[in-house]
């Protein structure tokens, strides 16, 4: 492929940004930006020795998506780049269709990445300005105003955006010099979407008045990112002290801190666990309604597809969990293991472990996840209400209706892995079972 002098800066940036990347997966939409990036990668491939693959994400949102995927396939075939088209389902949540599509896109790419492979995406300088202004509109702090990082991670894989220092005009000029063909997505004209409105109505006027506006925004984003990195370093030791081996966060350790420091630590705790960054009012609710609620409460705060719970003066970030209270699972343990719902694992008979009496003739076996009333367990003289018993055994509230309960007819025999009731106790010369819960 021919090279001209104006290409040198772009090519050198690609070489520098992808140094050490033996294998690369390009997120390839067929648009201008990713078409330029693919051409650049193919240009430097001969001397770099890098392995390049490309993946098109089929969102199913545009009737032309099939033809776009075919365009991408043909272009990759021409340049001898292995190609995949990945179909995703976009389910709009509170963040809207744009955010949902982005989430689905990155999830698909993360699954598609091979061991040791680096993901490249083609966002440019103007995209950075849009991202910054959208964060400003939301009232984001330095983390949000950091916009997009040139180097970050997607799971355990490096994520590199090598074109962030170049404008769309520069990429367009490159594409025209090399007579590239690319797709124009008609949805990019729809100004109902905030990003398109900024791109078409706001940024051109700002750049016309102040030509260096995108570069200035990029510098501000970098400064915000530096401030966030500094805070990460300064708060690292405090967070390590407050965080427990199971990921829970100590509430008592947060109480004496100033609200500013407390919220900074909460944000970093959530970020470390992969949660979407909460708005300021959500952080305040987290503290007021969950952390600082009365001691006997069992508060819950939903944060997108996660929930924050409190137990024994610690905060836990958990996935949303469907209730299993009404589930009744018939079981014949001697015939086969029992697969539990919601990926909870398997129950099976074993040669060792906690023993319960085998059922008598006429007793049917079932697994349930809820019971009520007073329970008498082996090793205790007096019965306890089941809620009190769970508390005394240190079982977190979210496990109390997800722990398999063994019933014979309507009689509670055991909470598998937790306790055996007097009704399930093995008497002398009685046949017995060892039931084991293998969790996923």
UniProtKB/Swiss-Prot annotation:
InterPro entries: Lysidine-tRNA-synth_C, Rossmann-like_a/b/a_fold, TilS/TtcA_N, tRNA_Ile_lys_synt, tRNA_Ile_lys_synt_N, tRNA_Ile_lys_synt_subst-bd. It catalyses: cytidine(34) in tRNA(Ile2) + L-lysine + ATP = lysidine(34) in tRNA(Ile2) + AMP + diphosphate + H(+). One of its GO terms (molecular function) is ATP binding. This is tRNA(Ile)-lysidine synthase. Keywords: ATP-binding, Cytoplasm, Ligase, Nucleotide-binding, tRNA processing. It comes from the Bacteria. It is found in: Cytoplasm. ATP binds at residues 29-34. One of its GO terms (biological process) is tRNA modification. The keyword Cytoplasm applies. It is an enzyme of class 6 (ligase). It comes from Pectobacterium atrosepticum (strain SCRI 1043 / ATCC BAA-672) (Erwinia carotovora subsp. atroseptica). The keyword ATP-binding applies. The gene is tilS. The N-terminal region contains the highly conserved SGGXDS motif, predicted to be a P-loop motif involved in ATP binding. Its EC number is 6.3.4.19. Its main location: cytoplasm. Ligates lysine onto the cytidine present at position 34 of the AUA codon-specific tRNA(Ile) that contains the anticodon CAU, in an ATP-dependent manner. Cytidine is converted to lysidine, thus changing the amino acid specificity of the tRNA from methionine to isoleucine. One of its GO terms (cellular component) is cytoplasm. Belongs to the tRNA(Ile)-lysidine synthase family.
